[in-house]
Amino acid sequence: MREKEKEEQKMKKLMMVAGAVALAGMFAGCASTREVVQKEYERVIALPPAERIHSPNKAVDDVARLSFDLYNFCHPLLKEYEAATTNHREYTGFMNDVQCVMKDEGLGEEDAMAKVYALVQGEDKDRPDAEKVWPRIKEGWAAANALNPAKKLAEIARLVVRNQEISESAAKLPDSFKDGDFQSKLQRAAEVDKITDQLTQSAELLAFLGEQYRKVQVNKFYNK
């Protein structure tokens, strides 16, 4: 009987090793992609609050105010998401791994998520309860889901439209100072460049949040 138990334990260990090798093999080619994904995630999360751009030109100053107000309306949404997920690295890691598999293996999002989910579940099978990863991923998902993704996505869609409207106004600003002297034209052009950069950051921030909340909704099928 003891020999049988030893053999079973040996087989379990071999299966655990095989699972680890399979997981490592799957993500070996994904390492560089994961690093890129993680760096981009960290870059957007670290975007600072906006600074108000001032201009003596009323048209430029008005658009600068609109851009500032929009960004500082969006930025707290980013900080809210960060605060909800910052202590749930397993969840953000899971979502980043899904993105890696999508890019490296050319899979659709649902197929990539199913693949990573199956691998995590396989790894968890032989782990002690305290070391299982999937329950921690579920905790992270629940924290993000508590922010009401459907409502957030509707709000983000509205803000994307507003960003586009302000961007179109910014594109017309050079007409407001075309008759000025050379030095003032340079100064106004520099101000418009700053406004454009700010609007670009707003667009990046909104795209990031939209993607995160959309993934929360897709992931709900695995967190019932």
What function would you assign to each model-found segment?
Residues 1-10:
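Short, Lys/Arg-enriched N-terminal segments with co-localized hydrophobic residues
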Residues 10-11, 186:
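Intrinsically disordered, low-complexity sequence elements enriched in Ser/Thr/Gly/Pro
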Residues 14-23:
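Sec-dependent N-terminal signal peptides
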Residues 26-29:
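C-terminal motif of bacterial Sec signal peptides marking the signal peptidase cleavage site
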Residues 31-117:
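Immediate post-signal-peptide N-terminus of mature secreted/exported proteins
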Residues 84-91, 95, 100-224:
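Extended amphipathic alpha-helical interaction segments
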